[in-house]
Amino acid sequence: KPLKLDHIKDRILGHWGTVPGQSFIYAQSIYLISKHQPSMLFISGPGHGAPSVFSNIFAEGTFGDFYEEFQRDAKGMSHLIKNFSWPGGLPSHVTPITPGSILEGGELGYSLATAYGAVFDNPELIAVCVVGDGEAETGPLAAAWQSNKFLNPAESGAVLPILHDNGYKISGPTIFGAMKNSEILNFFSGLGYEPRIVEGTNLHQKMMDVMEWAYQSICRIQKRARTSEKQFLAPRWPVIILRSPKGWHGIREADGKKIEGNFRSHGIPLGDVKSNPNHFKLLEAWLKSYRIEELVDAKGQPLPEILEFVPQGNLRMGHNKHAFGGNVRKPLKFPELRKYEVLFKQKGLTEASNTAIAANF
């Protein structure tokens, strides 16, 4: 149907700039899963771009598994769109209600530490962690890069950090966005990683190749550590730097001002589309550019070729068992507390160190 003014909410909320890049990474990740069937967990650092996660778990069918109203058809899609950033509906950021998520996406800086925590002593899990270039400037995130020093490939899983370097944060350029490729490579090499940069044209093929390289690197590191009698010290884990435009494939410019590839695409690119006819036309052209009629059938269900590489069952990242604590929880085994009791017959005569006793416990 043609776009009408009453199709548009009076107040539009959310963040666009990070969404296309994260959707791109999600799609590349599920393609890798379709090839090798690893257990992969998706962690969205810039979780304020929730549409990237919501749309993908909807497309893979996970959303509908947990919430009946989000079935993978026209009605479910309509419900998803209507209820995004809507009273009593879905929030504008990734939250605990999101299938497959273990991170609160509304506060930046904790994605990488969370990813490492998820894979410690969890040898079969790979956490794909998207780190925003603005997020990377926070203290917790900057420190978390060092967590690779504590990751034992013989006993733990792996983290695949993907720095989404789109060049801008909410109102200006980012530090990583201002760095040369050589500076970025040297930075991560100095941290003990093996970095690869994906940029330019034909990004789909480049990203597929680099994701495959990263996966094979992880497998080699883990195989060596788990089969060798000697301890494998300081492996160089892979890290990917994706340099793509902020607001990728969105509105290029409006009123003579650049939007795509600029901080203006961070949130809502055009907030007055109901009152500005020119902006309304830009919005309409933008929505039509996705050619939704080539992706879904008359019932709103994705065409078979669209789902060809989408994993099934628990291989879907939105259905990864490690994102649901109740599925993997184990009883916590405590020593018998009374064995560490300090016994005395008279006060003031017995000497004991509380730290030494606690250490024994």
What do these predicted regions represent?
Residues K1-S39, P46-G47, E135-G139, A158-I162, ...:
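Conserved acidic/glycine
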Residues P2-N152, P173, I357:
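Cofactor-binding active-site loop characterized by glycine-rich and histidine/acidic residues
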